[in-house]
Amino acid sequence: MVINDIESLTDQALADVAAAQNLDHLEVLRVALLGKNGSITLQLKQLGKLPVEQRKAIGEKVNCVRDLISVALMDRKAALESAALSKRLIDERVDVTLPGRRGERGGLHPVTRTLERITEIFARLGYELVEGPEIEDDWHNFEALNFPLHHPARAMHDTFYFGDGRLLRTHTSGVQVRYMSDHRPPLRMIAAGKVYRSDSDQTHSPMFHQIEGLLIDKHATFVHLKGTLSEFLRAFFERDFEVRFRPSYFPFVEPGAEVDIAWQQSDSSVRWLEVLGCGMVHPNVLKNVGIDSECYTGFAFGLGVERFAMLRYGVDDLRAFFENDVRFLRQFS
């Protein structure tokens, strides 16, 4: 008999399929039973050796067994895959009661922090924040502010000029000129924003941020200026230190002064640091904006925001504020 006990082979094959514990084992069984040299395949190959009268009946039986085993293999494969999926879902289940992952939080740039801190302090002192154009004309940037024609600030190596005579503002003082032209005293305002100068090194940038303040009123004096700036500096740095006013020259103020603070360094030594410039508004400036200098006086001051940010946060190189190094910026988030 070429066909060996097909019933026994079928029973054993179905039992082995049902006992398969994983997909790899099941694949081994499939190859052993239905593969090119599998036991069922070999039975089909031997049909040609049977007498003609037996081939049809036995062939139908072997084909039926093959189909039965194929169905059993598919059913067992589906069951094993379902069991594997269920196990994976259990292993990877999400506990919805656990807190979610916190998203990364950004932070304000240190220059922005410093700008907001300065403007908030002056707002408490009654100063209005005013903005103006970054592209200026010669009148608002120089002439109205009493800059003589020979002043070095007008030179090409200090100022960025456009071909039509306009320029990138070198300070925010032009905002003060516009404000004084449109408003009548008493005035109390600050102007904040980007300014541009042709200079770049460790402590200078071709673009930086500046805040300038202005007060115009009857009987405003240098004493009021000193009191305002001393109060601001102590509020900004949150410490009580000595403040020194040194005579200096600025075309738009008379008298003018540089302001120094007694800064305590990391080794506990103290040295004077220049932090801003100021002075009483020059009568010519008041005249240029239509304010009677016989009735009104005023004072003005200006400071570099990056300079204050460097002091507050201990930054040695101004360029760090503009390099977008995430490692640096994360310190302020």
UniProtKB/Swiss-Prot annotation:
Gene3D superfamilies: Bira Bifunctional Protein, Domain 2. One of its GO terms (molecular function) is ATP binding. It is found in: Cytoplasm. Tetramer of two alpha and two beta subunits. Belongs to the class-II aminoacyl-tRNA synthetase family. Phe-tRNA synthetase alpha subunit type 1 subfamily. HAMAP family: Phe_tRNA_synth_alpha1 (MF_00281). This is Phenylalanine--tRNA ligase alpha subunit. It comes from Xylella fastidiosa (strain 9a5c). The lineage of its organism: Bacteria, Pseudomonadati, Pseudomonadota, Gammaproteobacteria, Lysobacterales.
